[in-house]
């Protein structure tokens, strides 16, 4: 058994957080958007280079029942997010929405500012979703990737949840970073996907 990892998938409403998770776990895509009204916790097992890891993937806001926050001002105190022991973060934005990118920018800053003293730094992967709408994007990929990687010191990747493009790569990169930080001598990891459908429970 390889151990366990806690992952939080965050971002503005409508950017495709749930769609990304469902493509990774179940290989399906909801054609009709349904807002995530309550946080959802998925518990899949994944195989990485022959070792099985139990994942805990949190989808949606962490403020409790109710609609997802539409701005950072609507979030509760970061110290109450129950995310301080999270091993890795996925911050999702819509490549056609500059507002969703600003949301991720502010969210990343809050996560950094409120990490408990002495706690290991949790890797953050910024993900630009809806790559299938490339012609409508608000900014060039190269410039955004450079800003995130060099300025924010976070990982950067773009995907299309609709067409399942780079979704597996997204989680492979995230888990690789999380495990390398906890196990510096760990060899290159190869994510082979979820072993079985995840259990989902509303919190």
Swiss-Prot record:
It is a lipid-anchor. Potent inhibitor of cellular proliferation. Residues 201-203 form a propeptide. GO terms for molecular function: G protein activity; GTP binding. This is Ras-like protein family member 10A. The lineage of its organism: Eukaryota, Metazoa, Chordata, Craniata, Vertebrata. A motif (Effector region) lies at residues 33-42. PANTHER family: RAS LIKE FAMILY 10 MEMBER B-RELATED, RAS-LIKE PROTEIN FAMILY MEMBER 10A. The gene is Rasl10a. It comes from Mus musculus (Mouse).
